[in-house]
């Protein structure tokens, strides 16, 4: 089992509410790099979020092997911090590339939407609701495909959820009404994502969370003139405020069969054999080190064979000694 001490810390690549995400290098195999999320477990306990962390780790184990989800390889506890050792995905956030481009054309948006749908199909097939679909939670691999990250708000489908959680712009009407949100809420998030990819901003954007919530519950989607009729039809179906009639109610295949995806070979999508619209430039660290043959990422590369850690209950046992 991998330990935190088995890694050399290279640089910080992200900062969150409870810790940092580091780019790390395996000491025994210096050409292999990973992402390590280091969380302050004491703060997690104070915020009463230990159950949420335990749940996230459990879910990442359940969906291990999904080609569109960043893998969790191992967990460790050291010095009052929990380390989640994960697949490093070096192409940056979809959010970054979207803001850099302003908006995507339909071909580009269709590619990413198809891979997101394939990810949701896998996740839902394992009885899990993602519940936080947004461009910041989608990373691009070195070969141009997507990887979903951050399953902190995800839940098992069998659980009853009556709480508001997530990012305001992407919340579904039923979630705002504190109703039990199921797969339909993920399909709502997909609709928001597709709109944002095509238009540059979410459909219900405003300066305050309350104003956003009001628009989600009361306003209709307004499309720029350049959005095609078939794209409007797809987005309108996904952003149906009535989840009982929302596109996808009859199953995710209803979305996959929409004319917007005409010509898409879903088997090719799921096997990642469709050519991505672009290949991202590696970040500065990977670029400088990889050019000398010193470093390569774990995304899309069989560098080290690891198994996900199976005994996550140790977090609770260790916490008693804090």
UniProtKB/Swiss-Prot annotation:
Enzyme class per UniProt: transferase
InterPro entries found in the cross-reference section: AGC-kinase_C, Kinase-like_dom_sf, Prot_kinase_dom, Protein_kinase_ATP_BS, Ser/Thr_kinase_AS, STKc_AGC
An example Gene Ontology CC term for this record: cAMP-dependent protein kinase complex
Residues covered by the AGC-kinase C-terminal domain: 262-322
Domain Protein kinase, residue spans: 7-261
Catalytic activity: L-seryl-[protein] + ATP = O-phospho-L-seryl-[protein] + ADP + H(+); L-threonyl-[protein] + ATP = O-phospho-L-threonyl-[protein] + ADP + H(+)
Residues that, per the record, bind ATP: 13-21, 37
Protein name listed in UniProt: Probable cAMP-dependent protein kinase catalytic subunit
The organism of origin for this protein: Encephalitozoon cuniculi (strain GB-M1) (Microsporidian parasite)
């Amino acid at each position: 089992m991998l330990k935190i001490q088995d890694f050399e810390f290279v640089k910080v690549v992200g900062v969150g509410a409870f810790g940092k995400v580091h780019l790390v290098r395996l000491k025994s195999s210096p050409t292999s790099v990973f992402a390590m999320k280091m969380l302050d477990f004491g703060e997690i306990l104070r915020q009463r979020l230990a159950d949420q962390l335990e749940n996230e780790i459990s879910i990442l184990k359940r969906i291990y092997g999904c080609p569109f989800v960043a893998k969790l390889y191992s967990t460790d506890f050291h010095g009052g911090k929990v380390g989640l050792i994960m697949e490093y995905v070096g192409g940056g956030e979809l959010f970054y590339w979207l803001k850099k481009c302003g908006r995507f054309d339909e071909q580009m948006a269709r590619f990413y939407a198809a891979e997101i749908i394939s990810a949701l199909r896998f996740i839902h097939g394992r009885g899990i609701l993602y519940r936080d679909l947004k461009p910041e939670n989608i990373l691009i691999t070195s070969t141009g495909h997507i990887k979903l990250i951050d399953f902190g708000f995800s839940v098992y489908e069998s659980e009853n959820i009556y709480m508001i959680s997530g990012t305001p712009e992407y919340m579904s009407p039923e979630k705002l009404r504190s109703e039990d949100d199921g797969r339909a809420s993920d399909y709502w998030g997909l609709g928001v994502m597709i709109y944002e990819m095509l238009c540059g901003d979410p459909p219900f954007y405003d300066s305050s969370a309350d104003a956003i919530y009001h628009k989600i519950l009361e306003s209709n989607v307004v499309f720029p003139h350049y959005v095609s009729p078939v794209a409007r039809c797809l987005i309108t179906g996904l952003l149906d405020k009535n989840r009982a009639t929302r596109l996808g109610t009859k199953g995710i295949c209803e979305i996959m069969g929409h004319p917007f995806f005409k010509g898409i070979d879903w088997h090719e999508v799921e096997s990642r054999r469709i050519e991505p619209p672009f290949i991202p430039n590696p970040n500065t660290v990977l670029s400088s080190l990889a050019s000398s043959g010193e470093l390569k990422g774990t995304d899309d590369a069989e560098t080290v064979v690891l198994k996900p850690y199976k005994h996550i209950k140790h977090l609770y046992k260790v916490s008693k000694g804090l």
